[in-house]
Amino acid sequence: MNTEPGDLRPPAAATAPTHCTAPTPIVYSCSGCSSAAQLASPVALRLDRCGAAEMSCIAGVGGDVPHLMKTARSGRPIIALDGCPLVCVKSTLARHGIEPARHYQLQQYGVKKRAHEDFDPAQAALVLERVLDDLHYEPLTGAPTAAQPRRETAHG
């Protein structure tokens, strides 16, 4: 575990899925203008970089971009990170009939929504640690649908 305040580096590879046939989850994050929204993005990026999930673009889902819609509908488990109670990520997915396997509303971790302020990197590191712990203790399940048997890349 990282002990430096604000250190967003994930723990070593022990957090990556352990079952080789389990599909890598897709993670979508809020990217609004508040401090809470901006905190969600680096958490999603760290999940991507450590291999716990593959980040994709929620704006592309909202914009009906075909390639990104194909990824969202691939049948892989989805992690939604919403910065505030407006739950824009969850709502954008729901507009397309997509339910995340795991939804994290960052206010549940004490993240406050503040306009015109930067997020606290130490708080982002704590949120990352809690999300990784949750994913470790309650792994996501899911498999690609029959129509989409091969793994799609989530990068947008």
Describe each region flagged by the PLM.
Residues 58-62:
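A general structural motif
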